[in-house]
Amino acid sequence: YEKKKTKQQDDTHKDKIFNYGYQGKYNWTYDTTSNYQLKFDETQLKYYLDYQGPQRSSVSYERSELNPTTANYSSQVFNFRGTEESIQAAQGDYAFVNGDRPQSINSLFSSTGRQFNGYVITETTQLRFASSFSADFKNHAIMVGVEYDQRNLSGYTVNPIGLWERMRNLTNIHLAEFDTANPIIIAGTSGSLEQRYYRYLYDASKQNQIDKSLREALGLSVDNQSLINTDAFSPDDLKLSMFSAADLLQTGQVGSALVDYYGFDYLGNRDKNSTNLDKFLNDKDDKGNNTLHVGAYKPIYVAGYIQDKFDFKDLRFNVGVRIDRFDANQKVLKDPYLFQEAYTAGEKSEGKPGNIQDDYVVYVDNFRSSTPEVIGYRHYDEKTNTNTWYNSEGKEVSDPKALLGADGKLSPWIKDADFADKNPFSVNAFKDYKPQINVMPRVAFSFPISDIASFTAHYDVLTQRPTDGIMRFDPKDYYFINNTSSNPFLTNSNLKPEKTIDYEVGYQQVLNQKKNAALKLTAFYRELRNQITTQTLSNAYPKTYYTYVNRDFGTVKGLSAEFDLR
């Protein structure tokens, strides 16, 4: 049994993640009463003053000594300027605001004061049992062995410097439009014009958890319409729990996901449970936010082997077989082109052409329609990782664009359209990983041709498990796939071991009477199967993406010569 835990962090700030990238307080206020514009009311035939929204005052800077080198940049700017018109203007004058750090020099060298941006915890446990037995029986040397290996891999990562910009981007965005239908009329007096003041339209659906938490920290109600200045908070005022998991994981935001985790929750607390997709989609915290728990990666490897070395007349044999069983112990997509449940031709057989098999996926013009029209079918070959497309008449089509639906996309006939509109994937679109059993025979023999020459040959099969990083199942990737503007890259939890089949023959001969010189010639042929490569899964639903697949096949042929002189 072995347990290993590592932690990578800044040597000064350590786990105080809001200290990373903090430069100080940037203070400003909002004038919410005087920003009006003269307008004419065509209905009432009179002029009035129309409210145009709050105006922000100039920005002042209150230095912090947590990161003194980068704070020097900002101090120099504000000592010269006094104030700046905005945060963006300060950045334009090369001041660093919270969440900034100096850029690298030509992507080669770190600039003075460039802050380390990372807080990483990894935890790995391994339970391994191995046993072997050997015995000589007459002219046989027999060896038998078994092996069991179960690992538990967990990891947690925060990119803390980006937290400040993420707060800036996620606050106040629910207060974007004025409630012009319900103006507050301030009647004009003594010849002054009527003023029309507007409150914001409060859009609760767009209010992020960090916005709610900051308002609570300021003693404000959640629906208060004050505009928050996130750069006026100090690190001591903030906790990571003020964010929701979605706040930190939103890949549509600048800087992408700021946390990553498996075997931990998004706050860095150890979570020993396995990934449960139903809980991932539905479990919520006490604030009503999805917790998005991801369990540890727990692959299981079992192997057994037997080997026999023996002589038969002049032949010397080494014969054995090894059987490996690899279980990734995680969920995989039933069909890598579908994140939702879709009807097959067997389930919607009316009008099905005779050559269309029952397991082919049905495609329609609009799966949200009560009477969708079938426009084609798709057959996925798991062995070759390829699709074959057919039109509604059962004729094979080379370009699936011919099957585009009413929305300009290839639309599988989704079983539950309402669920698909609200959830990025369905639990029922996944299945358990099928354990891979590999039988690896090994045969080698040699025999003397004469006192000075011999011949050798062997046949060998080897397999190699996929590395953890390219096949660990992470439901967060599927959950946020629609937040990305480009086609994302997802790991493939359904990868199989790579296989090498090796054939080799050799000839060796002593070249002189002293027997201190020898020549060895070897010829070999290798087949490389199930090689892992990248592939674009075009027209997947809900989005095209890139991933790893077992697809490549290769052969290696060679001839070697070796001269040995002693």
Where are these regions (language model features)?
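Outer membrane beta-barrel strand-and-loop segments of large Gram-negative receptors
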Residues: 128, 484-496, 502, 514-566
